[in-house]
Amino acid sequence: MDVLTVVVSTADLHLANLQEVKRRRRRSHVRNRRARGYKSPSERARSIARLFQMLPFHGVDPVDWFPDVVRSPSVTSLVSYESFDDTDWFAGNEWAEGSF
């Protein structure tokens, strides 16, 4: 019985050591990537979204930040952001305006 507990505790220690080595390796890998200035697409999107939150709504043009996104014709025909009125809930809504 004593030998079995020693083997189990040795295996537990070995597993804990392997997990710690993996954790350290991952941490240094992330640190090195940050030092190189690399950002994954999701990290880049999060940082851009964080910047968007600090800007006023009417000053943001998503095309400047996301040139790959193609705008639909209905979005391009909308009025500019400067003339946007938050109180007009049905502006640009064809169904509410009775166009069909």
Curated annotation (Swiss-Prot):
Described purpose of this protein according to its UniProt entry: Multifunctional protein that plays two independent roles: viral suppressor of host RNAi (VSR) and viral inducer of host attractiveness to insect vectors (VIA). Acts as a suppressor of RNA-mediated gene silencing, also known as post-transcriptional gene silencing (PTGS), a mechanism of plant viral defense that limits the accumulation of viral RNAs. May directly interfere with mobile silencing signaling. Also inhibits signal transduction by the phytohormone jasmonate, making the infected plant more attractive to aphids, which are the second host to play a role as a dissemination vector.
Alphabetical list of Gene3D superfamilies matching this protein: 1.20.5.3800
Keyword check for Transport: no
Designated name of the protein: Suppressor of silencing 2b
Gene Ontology CC: one annotated term: host cell nucleus
A single GO BP: symbiont-mediated suppression of host innate immune response
One Pfam family linked to the record: Cucumo_2B
UniProt keywords, alphabetically: Host nucleus, Host-virus interaction, Inhibition of host innate immune response by virus, Suppressor of RNA silencing, Viral immunoevasion
Subunit structure: Homotetramer. Interacts with host AGO1; this interaction blocks AGO1 cleavage activity to attenuate RNA silencing and thus counter host defense. Interacts with host JAZ.
Family: Belongs to the cucumovirus/ilarvirus protein 2b family.
Top-level taxon of the source organism: Viruses
Organism: Cucumber mosaic virus (strain Q)
Motif (Nuclear localization signal): 22-27
Parts forming coiled coils: none
Location(s), subcellular: Host nucleus
Main location: host cell
